[in-house]
């Protein structure tokens, strides 16, 4: 198998689609966040899936940006960098949640509950160290990066514009999460997830069309031609 830029870009598109599907999947029947849930296998599986979602999203937006560097300009670069940093931080937070929190929940349940409170837009009763600024920066970079990157993709007119607009609006709407109960907060993931699926499919299809269109066709000589 020959690895080409087209192959890599199509893979990035599929990564974005997978990220969107995972983002929706981890929200389905999500239990209430509390110390008891942290001790379960389901917690580890869900947090690991969220970390994988962040990695796939990063791969996906990287492919989207590289496909349209010139068209998105400075705004695209800024949006990609900020959004990418956001996903890197989200990945780190989810890995910490999957590995560290279950290990300390019995010895320091108060700390774990404070971390969970901050993760859902609430306030910590005690000191949670670097987890406080880490969650804060993750929130700002996710919201700001998604908005800027979505606008840049919309203006570039290369990928599906409806999905680009939905990415900008969906990520920005996440700022309202602290205003809703945990059960309703899960709904805010759907617009961004659908946007990733739409953009990823658009990137994959666009590369597939370009690849098919470059196949050279040599006309046959008419029968009996001398």
Residue ranges of each PLM-predicted region?
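Hydrophobic, aromatic-enriched alpha-helical segments typical of multi-pass transmembrane helices
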Residues: 2-226
